[in-house]
Amino acid sequence: MAFTNPYLQRVYDDLAKRNPEQKEFLQAVEEVLESLEPVVAAHPEYEKAGLIERLVEPERIIMFRVPWVDDAGKVQVNRGYRVQFNSAIGPYKGGLRFHPSVNLSILKFLGFEQCFKNSLTSLPMGGGKGGADFDPHGKSDAEVMRFCQSFMTELYRHIGPDTDVPAGDIGVGGREVGYLFGQYKRLKNEYTGVLTGKGIPFGGSLARTEATGYGLCYFTKEMLADAGKSFEGQRVVISGSGNVAIYANQKATQLGGKVIAMSDSNGYIVDENGIDYKVMKEIKEVKRARIKTYLDYVPTAKYVEGSQGIWTVPCDIALPCATQNELPLAGAEALVANGCYAVAEGANMPSTPEAIAYLQSHGILFAPAKASNAGGVATSGLEMSQNSLRLSWTFEEVDERLHNIMVNIYHSAAATAEKYGMKGNLVAGANIAGFEKIASAMMSQGIV
């Protein structure tokens, strides 16, 4: 990667030398540093304070073994992690991911992105991420409980409501958060808001489940409005069929769009009449079945093997909501060729750098994940506030606050991009807007 700023080049080269195998992390850092060139050029004091070197290095990485006993009585050992990236503007905040693919590179990339995303919400939250290479799929409830209890038995000493507040992520839903919270409470003998994404009876927030998908659509609505467009009557393609995708479907439909395609890791479905989010919710959350099952409910829909083909479905708006790097250059080319004019990211870093460059060079409205999918962590922040105040807000109150936060994030990113001569470039605008708050806090707090 070639930067025009020699300071940024040196920082990136040193980082790549120290972490040559961490490609996801280096990709995330590269994208952010590229956006920061004009800001760093305007602030020579950042180099003197070693600000960027400190920004790209986590404050702390905790790695530990997680031994547990399966239903056959056999001892299993997984590896657990918590990356506490930056606490300049608040306690570490970010999800826990339980998936066989979990490694340090992925968690460092997610923790790094989380710093900027949390900053954009304007809530006092630092950035972190954690998880384990444990796969909850195919495990009994008892096995998942024993794993969560073992995981928390080590993690509990490193977290707390004013230190580090984890949440769910891939493989960590309401069930897992409940088991983790129960074990923390048992070990500490105190009832605090140490996790978000909790069940409603024990301190969870209404609208948290819907938040990322809803927030994505609120952000996209603002972006479309600025271009004189709206969801009304538009064909929408959503990759994925998890939490984010299901509620993005619901909100996009409420805003007048028609969601015609959704996917899972096996393939995708196309329903020209619009995919019913309630059916999808039943399939994925109740039956925990593959997306192909949609045909049992709607025989007129079409199923296609292989999830990559979803980008060839003609649409006006595309919302990638599955996983990182799922939208490659070929997918971006197919979207543009078929008339898509807006892409908003619902997953974390779902578009490759080549895909983003292609979309931007073709004048496509593009919303980067750290801005457009910040609804989840924004509502986690609202859950923390409710826990601290010992009260609960209604669904409507939380939804209204979420809507306002997403509108503000859009306008902050758009205004910052314009300020630095990059009008319409929300990637740069979001990176810089998120960075400015963290940089200011870090400069004020000295070399720590």
Role assignments for model-derived ranges:
Residues 163-167, 191-195, 238, 261-264, ...:
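General beta-strand structural signal in soluble alpha/beta enzymes
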Residues 12-13, 30, 104, 108-112, ...:
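Predominant activation on well-ordered alpha-helical scaffold segments within soluble catalytic domains
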Residues 73, 169-170, 205-212, 237-241, ...:
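Active-site nucleophile and cofactor-binding loops and adjacent substrate-binding regions
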Residues 1-206, 437-446:
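N-terminal ligand-binding/catalytic initiation module
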Residues 196-199, 204-312:
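Glycine-rich phosphate/diphosphate-binding loop of Rossmann-like nucleotide-binding domains
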Residues 2-28, 223-224, 336-448:
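Adenosine-phosphate binding glycine-rich loop
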Residues 267-366, 371:
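Rossmann-like adenosine-cofactor binding region
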Residues 84, 129-132, 171-172, 176, ...:
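Glycine-rich beta-alpha junction loops
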